[in-house]
């Protein structure tokens, strides 16, 4: 997997590497952390009545929800205090997008890795938990759960098994060698 740096963001989201604030676990690898700090300060000051409006100008809400769902699904045991990336174009109203990284500590303990209560200040989980205070955001989370975990969703057992088998087949010869 490519490291989700400013170059990564530029390649997949458009623009140039230097157009981006790219963070590795809250530290700038491209650009600055100014907007990140501003966003977190506003999140701390927000109320249930204004949190979605306040943070939606900084965060791609569906991306944040999906990012959190993936970490919950896998019970990521090596996350939220580190092993995450976020990037946004450095311009007004540009939104942070979140990227999983170094997630080898997932799917290890199906019965004991409930990560739904993770809430660390200055990390993605804090933003998510602040947003959960709003009923409309909770409904949006439920819609994303429905999309990904039911029907033909990406995280249904059938779709996940198909994806894992495809990946296993791609690396089989390299592992055998």
Where do the language-model regions lie?
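C-terminal catalytic region of ATP-dependent kinase domains
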Residues: 91-177
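Low-complexity, compositionally biased segments
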Residues: 22-24, 65, 69, 81, ...
